[in-house]
Amino acid sequence: MILEIIIFLLTTLVGYYYWSYKQLHKYFDDRGVKYVPGLPVFGNVFRSTFGKTHSLYDLLDVYKAYPDEKYVGYMEPMLPILLIRDPEIIKNITIKDFDHFTDHRGHFFSEDSDPLFAGSLFLMKGDKWREMRTTLSPAFTTSKMKYMMPFMVENSNNVLEYLNEHQSQDIDVDDLIRRYTNDVIASSGFGLQVNSFKNKENEFFQIGSNIFEFDVRQKIFTVLISQFPSLAKKFGARLFPDKTYNFFREIVLSTMEYRRKEKVERPDMIQLLMEAPRGKKLLLFSEWTAEELISQVFVFFAGGFETIASAIAMTIHELALNPNVQEKLYQEIRNNNEKTELTFENLHELKYLDCVLNETLRKWCPAIIMDRICVKTYELPPPREGGKPCILKPGDVVYNMVNCLQMDPKYFPDPEVYDPDRFSDENKHNIKPFTHLPFGSGPRICIGKSRY
């Protein structure tokens, strides 16, 4: 009897997944959208789910499959997605018709079970996101950001001291940059003096290093909860363990309590977020809760640690491979330092440094896609000449391509060549709008980038 029940359940489950898999095909076929058939359950992300490749290459395979299409179909586990390949459509989705695509893709974690992630600005939706964004924006003005510059310089000196003490030894550059990034965020974000070069096993660095290190088990878990989102929320599934949540909660709350009690102010992210709501009439928030503030500070850390560390590490990698670029950048920085010490204001005078960073973010962009979820019925133009328009309904998901466009020879000739001069004043007019979007685009652009 038990065996028969098991066989029945397995047969039903297999039948359900096969039917769902065929529905994905039907979704694209009905809309006249070309797609690459994936595998049942996993869609087009089978390889990346099991760690065989990075998710970028799953996207790239589909992106390259139909080079003349403005958008193509992509399958994540039981979810049809449109990959937007056309810069003009990306412009419409992220700016012109933003009111149809105000939100990021829905997630599988409730604010009750995973307040660190679910309660962040990045995942807020609709009016709640709009109000939080308006409230937070003053914290990212140029006048506020420049006060964090001394913290970065101080931590840079720690790097120089470490390098001077280990001149005769091999240096793990990736580890070096991660420790530097960790210390800058700890100081400018949390008001903590953490020297990860002397205290290599400090808890702040350990948690930051492991926060997004998903093993195969965690990836499969993510696939499963994406199949059963209601169960994930019901049973309190969360992306981060209790240890991570409790660590950040304790840091933020204890720091806030100390500063309020002792009337201490420090120009870091916690202070800016504490001050942001002052004098503002909040419509959807009666007041900022501790959980909401903790969530914003956490995302400042999580969103900055990996992306900044990767960008700096890849810049160093490219400078090592391109000594001519390295020498040109070195001379620019040296000439500037001979005139004056580095400040927030004269940092903007380093034009070639800006070109170098832009080229790194083109070739090695941490942001692979800009996801958007349709909130109002919307008509996309035909994917090709002679095709039919595609009607999107509320809940439909689009991925505006970032990395794939930036490595497309159609928009960037010889994309594998590291050439910062693409972004020089003389050449940057050749870059087609909406093909270089490392910080996003439109009202949901990175809040730090939006202030500059």
Question: For each predicted feature, which ranges?
Answer:
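Cytochrome P450
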Residues: 1-14, 74-82, 143-154, 164-187, ...
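N-terminal membrane-proximal hinge/A-helix region immediately C-terminal to the signal-anchor transmembrane segment
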Residues: 2-114, 127-131, 151-161, 244, ...
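Conserved cytochrome P450 K-helix E-x-x-R motif and the immediately C-terminal K′/meander segment
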Residues: 46-68, 250, 254, 340-387, ...
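Conserved cytochrome P450 catalytic core segment spanning the I/J/K helices
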Residues: 46-50, 60, 141-143, 168, ...
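Hydrophobic mid-domain F-helix/FG-region of cytochrome P450s
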Residues: 78-91, 118, 157-160, 171-198, ...
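Cytochrome P450 heme-thiolate "Cys pocket" and heme-binding signature region
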Residues: 118-119, 387-389, 394, 426-452
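Cytochrome P450 catalytic-core helices
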Residues: 307-332, 450-452
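Conserved cytochrome P450 K-helix/beta-meander segment immediately N-terminal to the heme-binding cysteine loop
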Residues: 400-428
